[in-house]
C-alpha cells in the first residue's frame, strides 16, 4: 500500500499498545480515527466517542512514509499533549512519541488499516463531546 495523499474522508483503525510510566492505555488499545477534513478528526473506541474535534497535521513524505501530528485538547486526562506519529504504509504501522506539556509521556506502537467509517456516536454516548485521544 502506498502512502495516501490525504487522510480526509478516511477512517483508520489502530490496534496496538501504549508504553508509559502508567502502563498501557487499554481503553484505546483498539480505536478508529475518522478524518472529517484535512485538519480535524474524531476518535471512537468500543462504539463510544472518545475524542472530538482533534486537530491534526498530515504530510506524505514519499510512496511509503508519512508524518502525522495530533493535538488533542485532552489525552488520558492530560492537556498540552502532542502525538508525533510515523506512519509506514508498507508495513501498516503507526509508531508515535507522545509529549505532555513538552515532556516525554508515552509511546504508541500499533498497526493501522483503513475501515468503513463507523456510525458516529451521539453526544450522550461515551464521553460525549469531551475531547481526548
Predicted regions and their residues:
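Short, solvent-exposed secondary-structure boundary motifs
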Residues: 15-27, 44-50, 71-77
